[in-house]
Amino acid sequence: MRINVNDEYSILKSVVVSSADYFDPSNLAINNETIRHYADNGGVPTKEAILEEQRYFWDVLKKLGVKLLIADQVDGAKGQMFTRDLAFVIGDKFFISSMKKENRRLAINGWNNIINQIDQDKIIKVPNNIYLEGGDIIVDNKTIYVGISERTT
């Protein structure tokens, strides 16, 4: 599989997605202020609402001609539907994130069917002692922005 990302605003050709089938709102990890706000105010969405929203989103992507690469489900991998955090691409290099929370680290195992299609010399695993999530990375051609949060070192 050929990969290449030089910016965040060019036409999206393919994207990794993961089903929200395993989402359990009763077992929601309160790990940031946004989630805490919604949990404290009764605004945590139902599983059905999330699945419906995801279906609509996937339908829009397909109508736009985006190829969906669907990750396999991994038991115990909370937040697996947040695929942006698990890995990222800069140029032609595929980086496997190093997640701080162990249950989040499990989720990348669902990507094996996708990772196995990438040239192994293009894959870089972020070391375990550096916490870096793909959602903290923004690529803008020769400039790469890295956000820093409580879960990033």
Which stretches of residues belong to each language-model region?
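The feature marks the mature, well-folded catalytic cores of soluble enzymes
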Residues: M1-T153
